[in-house]
Amino acid sequence: MTDRLTIRRPDDWHVHLRDGAMLAHVAPYTARQFARAIVMPNLSPPVTTAEEGRAYRDRITAAVPADLDFTPLIVAYLTDATDADEIARGHAEGVFTAAKLYPAHATTGSAHGVTDVANIMGVLERMQDIGMPLLIHGEVTDHDVDIFDREAVFIERTLEPLVRALPGLKIVFEHITTAEAAQFVADAPANVAATITPQHLHINRNAMLVGGIRPHAYCLPVAKREHHRLAVRAAATSGSPKFFLGTDSAPHAVHMKEASCGCAGIFNAPFALESYAMAFDQDGALANFEGFASEHGPRFYGLPLNEGTVTLERAEITVPDRIGDVVPFHAGETIGWRLV
């Protein structure tokens, strides 16, 4: 049995750091665990220009303690009106690492998102030409589609045609939650990859709904049936370079979660590596953890691997019920790994 696990410094390829007071509260947790993070642009207003991206990067850097070596990677928020030249300029200037496709109204802060992918094909063609990755929240928003089916329907209606139309575009199918998504990514060409969150390794939809409404287990995409959780977990722990770490850590204050219309999002940053390690350990796949956490992501993005290492050790720690005004993932639970 492995009691200590040392891996190359990992990265988080999908995180919400928010802004203002919440940014100051949560950014240090991500920066302690990860060397780099792809930071989501769904602020109010969203990050759509290079100037806005540069300013947000500066605010993140100011929120991270000076003794932590952390690089925020900024993402452009795509809208129906996005200008391809602006996206290309931000990428060329080193401001934008990638661009994010939110289907309009799919999740928190997506009201300005894209109503039809056809509206941004010119932008996507330019991104293909310059090697800029597209990050996708892969759910349809049609009212006639059941919320548990939105990811699978998105693959059929939007993602499959997009991959065919733009075979050179790097695409990250973010926070996958279904067997269909895991299979699609596994079978897709090398330019298609996926991120996987810790919560979708550990919980199914019962966590939200059994014994009462559990708002702190509510995120988008929602957790699905158990067979989907098992398929996503098998993909994560498989060693395939197509799957890598993206926490989708998404903090909301308690009163925004525990409400008649509560917000979607799970704050997992404080114990993210421990949570992932627990899943890999349970599945006898610790040998594949470094690839998932530290290697597959940068290789897909074409970025250098991090120098240095982090060490996790087998130790029981109890996750606090609250961290400030936010309830963390695994609140009140004992987990079996600790970041040294």
Curated annotation (Swiss-Prot):
For the protein in the UniProt heading, the enzyme class is hydrolase
Q: Which residues bind substrate?
A: H16, L17, R18, N42, H137, L220, H252, A264
Q: What biological processes does GO assign it?
A: 'de novo' pyrimidine nucleobase biosynthetic process; 'de novo' UMP biosynthetic process
Give the source's domain of life in one word.
Answer: Bacteria
Annotated signal peptide? none
Q: Which Gene3D superfamilies match?
A: Metal-dependent hydrolases
- Binding, Zn(2+) 2: K100, H137, H175
Chain sites annotated for binding Zn(2+) 1: H14, H16, K100, D248
List the active site. D248
Could you give the cofactor binding note from the entry? Binds 2 Zn(2+) ions per subunit.
Q: Which SUPFAM superfamilies match?
A: Metallo-dependent hydrolases
- Family per similarity comment: Belongs to the metallo-dependent hydrolases superfamily. DHOase family. Class II DHOase subfamily.
Q: Which HAMAP family match?
A: PyrC_classII (MF_00219)
Q: What is this protein called?
A: Dihydroorotase
**Taxonomic classification, please?**
Bacteria, Pseudomonadati, Pseudomonadota, Alphaproteobacteria, Sphingomonadales
